[in-house]
Amino acid sequence: MTQEVLEAVKEAKEQSKPRNFTQSVDMIVNIRDLDVKKPENRFNEEVTLPNGRGKEVKIGVIADGELIVQAKDAGVALVINKADLEELGKDRKAAKKAANSVDFFIAQADMMPLVGRFLGPILGPRNKMPKPVPASIKLDPLLERLQSTVKVGIKQQPAIQIIVGSQDMSDEDLAENIETVLTVLDRHLDKGRNQIKSMFIKTTMGPIVRVI
C-alpha cells in the first residue's frame, strides 16, 4: 500500500491552503465487520512513530517529590502536585482546561487513585488517562519517547483518527509513519488491513484525500 499512501500524502499536502501555523497530518481509518461492543475487539496501544510527530508533544506530569523536580527541570508543559490535583477536582472548568492543554499525562503510580477520583471523569473520555510510573523513574528517556508517540485505539466506533506527523515532514517519512500504524492494525484485526473499509489522509484544515 506504500505507493498509494505516498500519493495520498502528496495530494493532501498540495491541496492544503497555506496557514499561519504548521498543520498536522492525520490518517482516518474506518473498519468493516467489527463489533465494538465486544471487549476483545477494542484496544488502545501507544505506538512510536519512526519519524516522530513533527511537532512538539505537550506532556503533563502529576507527581510529588523528586518527580516534580525532574518534571520542572525538563520544562514539561504542565506540572500538577497533590494539592493542585485536589483543587482541579473542585473546579471542573479548570480540569477541562488542563486536560485540553497537553497530549499525554504521566502520573506517579501511588497517586493514580487520586487521579482517578479527581480527574478520571475528565481524562477518561479524552483518552488521556495518565501513564503510571514509579517514583524512582528517570523521566527524561520517557519524555523523549513520548515526543514520537501516538495512541492507536478503537473504543466506541470502528474507526481511528490520529496524527501521523506534520505538513513540513517529507512525504516518505509520513508514509513510513502511516505504515507503522497499519502494522498495528494488522496485529489487532482478524483480517489485518484487509478489514479496512476506507482510509483517508488530511492536514488539520485541508480536504480529505482517499487512499482506499
UniProtKB/Swiss-Prot annotation:
A Pfam family: Ribosomal_L1
Subunit structure: Part of the 50S ribosomal subunit.
Superkingdom field: Archaea
A Gene Ontology molecular function term of the record: tRNA binding
Example GO biological process: translation
SUPFAM superfamilies: Ribosomal protein L1
GO cellular component: a single term: large ribosomal subunit
Keywords: Repressor, Ribonucleoprotein, Ribosomal protein, RNA-binding, rRNA-binding, Translation regulation, tRNA-binding
Functional description taken from the UniProt entry: Binds directly to 23S rRNA. Probably involved in E site tRNA release.
InterPro entries to which the protein is assigned, alphabetical: Ribosomal_uL1, Ribosomal_uL1-like, Ribosomal_uL1/biogenesis, Ribosomal_uL1_3-a/b-sand, Ribosomal_uL1_arc, Ribosomal_uL1_CS
Alphabetical list of HAMAP family matching this protein: Ribosomal_uL1_A
Protein name: Large ribosomal subunit protein uL1
Family statement: Belongs to the universal ribosomal protein uL1 family.
